[in-house]
């Protein structure tokens, strides 16, 4: 039974991300490099966030329980802010690299920023999902594990779906974020930051599984729709894609936009 929970939750959390990688990235070496670079940027942001949280914890050591709770909330919000800062830094790096490639070899077609936004967002999302869910997933293999410390038996299933949401949201956030940077609409960056903070804040009321998942999926659908439109999608292009009549639909179009 525990093996079924383990593999079921693993496929729920990482199955869509694995499918995206296999069908849209694995066949292109350059995309794999950008994906790994995006994952590395997220790892560096996590390292810096951990250092900030550790220093804050040392400063307020031996304080009462509520203070420790506020420290945890502070750490989560700082982590989100640093992640978005590194997303912006990665955008600037990719922009400079694209401009440098054009100046060195004008005849070379550089990958579109929309494609790079998707790939980097998937890199952010996969690494975020791995670090947030792997420990919980390993506990599901325990002998007769139902819940953790009296939690609901649905805890693992809830965590798997939340991990799925976070991974896909990072993809959508990446596309919307890069689009805002390209158009110099800085309010879009603020919206990405606020929605990221909102989804992260929901983890502090994790006992309300139904409410958390419903609100997270609403944000996912809204951000997914926004990302689809920002990537140049339309009802017509979606129809052509579903009918397999447009081979250059969105991500497979290599023309710089």
Swiss-Prot record:
Domain of life of the organism encoding this protein: Eukaryota
GO molecular function, one term: protein-macromolecule adaptor activity
GO CC list: endoplasmic reticulum; endoplasmic reticulum membrane; endosome membrane; gamma-secretase complex; Golgi membrane; membrane; plasma membrane; transport vesicle
Entry annotated with the keyword GTP-binding: no
Tissue: Weakly or not expressed in leukocytes, lung, placenta, small intestine, liver, kidney, spleen thymus, colon, skeletal muscle, heart and brain.
Keywords carried by this UniProt record: Membrane, Notch signaling pathway, Transmembrane, Transmembrane helix
Membrane topology: Multi-pass membrane protein
Places the protein is found: Membrane
Subunit structure: Probable component of the gamma-secretase complex, a complex composed of a presenilin homodimer (PSEN1 or PSEN2), nicastrin (NCSTN), APH1 (APH1A or APH1B) and PEN2. Such minimal complex is sufficient for secretase activity, although other components may exist. Interacts with PSEN1 and PSEN2.
Family, as annotated: Belongs to the APH-1 family.
The protein's name in its UniProt record: Gamma-secretase subunit APH-1B
Annotated organism of origin: Homo sapiens (Human)
Gene that this polypeptide is encoded by: APH1B
């Amino acid at each position: 039974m525990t093996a079924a929970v383990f593999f079921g939750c693993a496929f729920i959390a990482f199955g869509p991300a694995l499918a995206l990688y296999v069908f849209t990235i694995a066949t292109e070496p350059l995309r794999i490099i950008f994906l790994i670079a995006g994952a590395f940027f997220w790892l560096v942001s996590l390292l810096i966030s951990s250092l900030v949280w550790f220093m804050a914890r040392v400063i307020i050591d031996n304080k009462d329980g509520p203070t420790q709770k506020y420290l945890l909330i502070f750490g989560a919000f700082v982590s989100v802010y640093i992640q978005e800062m590194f997303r912006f830094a990665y955008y600037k790096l990719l922009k400079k690299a694209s401009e440098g490639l054009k100046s060195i070899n004008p005849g070379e077609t550089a990958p579109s920023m929309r494609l790079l936004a998707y790939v980097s967002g998937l890199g952010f999302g996969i690494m975020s999902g791995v670090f947030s869910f792997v420990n919980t997933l390993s506990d599901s293999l325990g002998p007769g594990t139902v819940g953790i410390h009296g939690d609901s038996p649905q805890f693992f299933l809830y965590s798997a779906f939340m991990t799925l949401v976070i991974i896909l949201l990072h993809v959508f956030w990446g596309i919307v974020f890069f689009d805002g940077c390209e158009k110099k609409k800085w309010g879009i960056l603020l919206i990405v930051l606020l929605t990221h903070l909102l989804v992260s804040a929901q983890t502090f009321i994790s006992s309300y599984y139904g409410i958390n998942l419903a609100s997270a999926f609403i944000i996912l659908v809204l951000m997914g729709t926004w990302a689809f439109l920002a990537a140049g999608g339309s009802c017509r292009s979606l129809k052509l894609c579903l009918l397999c009549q447009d081979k250059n639909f969105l991500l497979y179009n290599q023309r710089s936009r």
